[in-house]
């Protein structure tokens, strides 16, 4: 049902034109909005509800300001036509959406999500790391296995002619190294591969000097030390190094093929005492 039409405002005494009244004499018909039956039919239910709320609010403001006047026919019609503002008169589009939600097309997420249990405040416990053995016991399925920490290459890895990749060299274990160094020093426990190295090492503990100099009789622990020591017994006029020892007379490194051994201070202490 369409709302009542706008009332015709009769001219009052002193007005030149209808509707042109003096300031301060405002009625509800001056500020209200009226629709024709054709215009009212084009409005949606939501727009009609908004129109009702605005008109009732405007009428309430005028009453609060103390403007006199009878109750407008539009407000009376809004109060009588309660069916036009019932929940059944809804927007068709909104009604379809709400109907779809009622049918279960769009589930409610709040209903599906479980409620969170409030956690007790306190220090968090650190996660306990379990060993692979415990994980294997909990998972008896043979398909679920724990991978080893380090992938080991196959023992008999052959050379691949297609890619040309060489098999990785095996890393000797501690047991293999201990098996190679079978000669152990009884004094310090150090191990050696060859017995000659063990014999030379034991002279450090015993203080034995089995290599004497044939010219002066000075004894040394190693044979190459005797050969280096014999340089000081050479004549000062014959040898290539038979000059006064100094910076230029002694090379920094021995030359390959040189018969003279490397010169060390511990091999010729007497020369520095005699000639400086």
UniProtKB/Swiss-Prot annotation:
Pfam families the UniProt entry points to: KRAB, zf-C2H2
Alphabetical UniProt keywords: DNA-binding, Metal-binding, Nucleus, Repeat, Transcription, Transcription regulation, Zinc, Zinc-finger
GO CC term, one of those recorded: nucleus
Location(s), subcellular: Nucleus
Entry's Gene Ontology molecular function annotations: DNA binding; DNA-binding transcription factor activity; zinc ion binding
Annotated stretches, region: Disordered: 1-22, 80-170, 236-255
Ranges annotated as C2H2-type zinc finger: 183-205, 211-233
Residue ranges with Pro residues bias: 1-10
Amino acid composition bias (Basic and acidic residues), ranges on this chain: 91-119, 127-140
Domain KRAB: 26-97
Function description: May be involved in transcriptional regulation.
Similarity-based family: Belongs to the krueppel C2H2-type zinc-finger protein family.
Protein name: Zinc finger protein 688
Native species: Homo sapiens (Human)
Name of the gene encoding the protein in the UniProt record: ZNF688
